[in-house]
Amino acid sequence: MRGPPRGVRGADMTTSEPGGATPKPTPRPTPHPTPRPVPRPSRVAPVVAAAPSSDPHRFGRVDPDGTVWLITGSGERVIGAWQAGDTESAFAHFGRRYDDLHTEVALLERRLATGTGDARKIKSAAAALAESLPTASVLGDVDALSARLSSILEQADEAAQNERAQRDEYRAAQTARKEALAAEAEDIAANSTQWKAAGDRLREILDEWRTITGLERKADDALWKRYSAARETFNRRRGSHFAELDRSRVSARQAKEELCERAEALADSTDWGATSAAFRDLLAEWKAAGRAAKDVDDALWQRFKAAQDTFFSARNAAHAERDAEFKANAAAKEALLAEAEKIDLSDNEAARAALRVIGEKWDAIGKVPRERAAELERRLRAIEKKIREAPTGGVDPEAKARADQFRARAEQFERQAEKAEAAGRTKDAEEARASAAQWRQWAEAAAESLEKRR
């Protein structure tokens, strides 16, 4: 603002009103961090400030002695004394002061209309200007400025309320975001066992947390305590889990080392049936023992598997050798059957003798593959039946059939005894031999009786 020209005097020329001199300094409010609201539409209709063209002659007069008067709707008042020039200079000087005041009002209107200022500060500035108008040393339409300042105060109050509502809405939204993040962190802390993914998510929550501002300090502190407590709970659970995992791995290692020793002790066994069952039991124990550390677990498994492979390779080789032997036995019995089918039935005694020789060879050959045993036995029984039922030349057929039946039963029990012996069923083998001996005795007695009747 321009200073007064030389010769102007009066108490009003040294006042500190707007348009007259610098306002009294007031403490600047301490800035508080506040959320930055989203762009908002103008809350009041734009006020287009008129150009500073107020005619000072319409709103004042200058007395011959230099006294300057302001004319308002409520009357006249002295605003100063002018002795620095002619009357027009006084009008020009005090008119410029009004123009400066008008410019300040227009600036407040523009800031309020465009939303570029804090409505509370605009209201405070407008109130200060309105308070200074009754003593302002200006010539112009002060009543119009007063009306415009009243409008600014009203509109600024409404704008301040809107801003407050927006701040409250923004603060509530930001608080809700942190509420949701705190609740998610608490759920992770209480329930999650996906340790890596959960730990990563807690770090992501923290990164997002730091971007959320504008909360009330008390609410923000309370939510931070919830998140921090959840993170500590999760870290304790995770630490306990891995400590327990380490303990279980040590236990699993000890158990599997013992299983390896037991497996290695069985590796050279030739008791194929019992040892196969033992290895199945060991494998079940292995699966139930849990896992050691990966490298340790892999090494122990290779050790266990090596012992297992040693045994089963030997068993498979023995079975292959046995199968080859049984196959050769089947071929030998095929040859005996072919020989038996060629026996001459015209001489019954000779036929029976030949069949007995074949039966002895048959029993001496031993076992055949399981799938061939029934077939070969059935063919031999058919040949025995054919020889048994052949005409006997004067011998009682029923007595002869009975003697043959006794002999067949004896042979049947003898074969049962051999099978039981091979299977390790000693008691069954002894019982079968005893039955065979009894039937053999009866068969011999029947044969002697037939000889006497010839």
From Swiss-Prot:
Record carries keyword RNA-binding? yes
| Keyword ATP-binding appears in the UniProt entry | no
Q: Which UniProt keywords apply?
A: DNA-binding, RNA-binding
Identify the stretch(es) annotated as Disordered: 1-60, 390-454
Q: Cite the InterPro entries for this sequence.
A: DUF349
What does the UniProt entry report for the null mutant? No visible phenotype.
Induction or repression: Constitutively expressed throughout the cell cycle (at protein level).
Q: Which residue ranges have biased composition labelled Basic and acidic residues?
A: 397-433
Q: What else is known?
A: There are about 700 copies of the protein per cell during exponential growth.
Q: Specify the protein name.
A: Uncharacterized protein MSMEG_2731/MSMEI_2664
